[in-house]
């Protein structure tokens, strides 16, 4: 019987993709609309998500920075999506952030506590 090698895609790789999505969203917002706040927020939250993913790759139990970053972004962009009803960019980032929060929660709860 083969040994379970864990999840199909390690969580930190999903996290790096999420961080790239957030950062590129800020860059695109700046390029299309000249929005400096969008650029700053995208790079800040993308950088924090990237750092959180790196921490996760070093220690799978160290989820807090990534969880707080994606949870905060889910809340902020969720409110923007609720008020604007525009999927791009608020709905996309809110949805991706919520999925990351759920994935982190499932991952944290499914690991045996030591």
UniProtKB/Swiss-Prot annotation:
It is found in: Mitochondrion membrane. GO terms for cellular component: mitochondrial membrane. Belongs to the TMEM14 family. It comes from Bos taurus. One of its GO terms (biological process) is regulation of heme biosynthetic process. It is a multi-pass membrane protein. This is Transmembrane protein 14C. InterPro entries: TMEM14, TMEM14_sf. Keywords: Heme biosynthesis, Membrane, Mitochondrion, Transmembrane, Transmembrane helix. It comes from the Eukaryota. PANTHER family: TRANSMEMBRANE PROTEIN 14, 15, TRANSMEMBRANE PROTEIN 14C-RELATED.
């Amino acid at each position: 019987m083969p040994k379970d090698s864990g999840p199909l895609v390690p969580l930190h790789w999903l996290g790096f993709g999420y961080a790239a999505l957030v950062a590129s969203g800020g860059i695109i917002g700046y390029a299309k609309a000249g929005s400096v706040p969008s650029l700053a927020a995208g790079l800040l939250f993308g950088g924090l998500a990237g750092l959180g993913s790196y921490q996760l790759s070093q220690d799978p139990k160290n989820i807090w920075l990534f969880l707080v970053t994606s949870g905060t972004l889910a809340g902020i962009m969720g409110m923007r999506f609720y008020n604007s009803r525009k999927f791009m960019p608020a709905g996309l980032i809110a949805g991706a952030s919520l999925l990351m929060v759920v994935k982190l929660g499932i991952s944290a709860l499914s690991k045996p506590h030591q």
